[in-house]
Amino acid sequence: MTNLLFEVSQRLHKLPPYLFAKIDKIKQEEIQKGNSLISLGIGDPDLPTPDFVIDRLVRAAKNPQNHQYPSYWGMLEFRKAVARWYQSRFGVKLNPESEVLTLIGSKEGIGHIPLAFVNPGESVLVPDPGYPVYHAATLLAGGHPIPFALKEKNKFLPDFGEIERQIQSSTKVKILFLNYPNNPTSASASLEFFKEVVSFAKKHQIIVCHDNAYSEIFYDHCPQPSFLQAPGAIDIGCEFHSISKTFNMTGWRVGFLVGNPKIIDGLAQVKTNIDSGAFNACQEAATEALNHSEPFCSNLRRIYQERRDILIPALQATGLKCQKPEATFYAWARLPEGYPSENYVLDLIRNQKIVATPGNGFGQEGEGYVRFTFCSEASVLKQVAEILRKTRYF
């Protein structure tokens, strides 16, 4: 047999090393030893999808027409449901035919949108720390990522004055990625902040891509805004959303993009050439979810708030600095100065059998922080709290 050299493309070489490979290796070693691990590392809801959504899926799956190729843009029924939900939840009016696009999960849309608007060598502003897909999608499109720091002193909001200095000598900046409520920092943003974003984007002629996947996971009666609520936002931007976190449907892969119709159309052109749309039965079930989101979402928030109020004091008791978040199901905990994130996480796995995520996995500015999730039952989090209270590291 001829030996072939299967050399991957240069774009793959540009992707950062997979930090979590070492953590996964340690996890597997512990499991092979017979040790049980408590995982607070992955933001994947442990709660079940609501029954009324599953019932709609079952009915939809029995319709033979739903097993044919779906529309590239998505079912109009689902897009109308998205528009109604945005009107009801945020007071934002959308045209379901031109301002709503169905996605195979919001991650797919985020991963593809640079292909629609970024030419090789052009720049994209990505938050640091931030969801790694923003950075990876830019590189895979041949773009140049410009990380901008999210610092605790600024409540993990960007400093637009500093960003302006960063981009003075850069190639054309095409996209600004934002994400509030934020993963991994759990920070929230106000409508006043989004007004500032609109002003900055219009000044520099930049497309704003806001990731709003955690808008419905909020606490203490503090609903989170949509970027599109800001005056003029739809002129320069779009918003990614998903049913994954809101309805415990991460495996179903249904999301949506809303906003400026030219931005929507650009991503739709990419999708037309790359995928064949989301399964219609899943879109029907997602329609049911959006049409009957309450009281399900209220109860979901109650559960996560109970979990938050168990875990945060336990983290603080170990010597970690950790604010109680207004939204998301993440705790973003700061280690003492000079203590590496990876070292802490590996030690936590080996000695306490608890899995968390090192902050530097989300970017350079994440070093010195650790992310924990609330995606475990209250009884498990109470067990974690007891373990942590007996183990004061600092």
PLM region spans:
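Active-site phosphate-binding strand-loop segment of PLP-dependent enzymes
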Residues: 146, 150-221
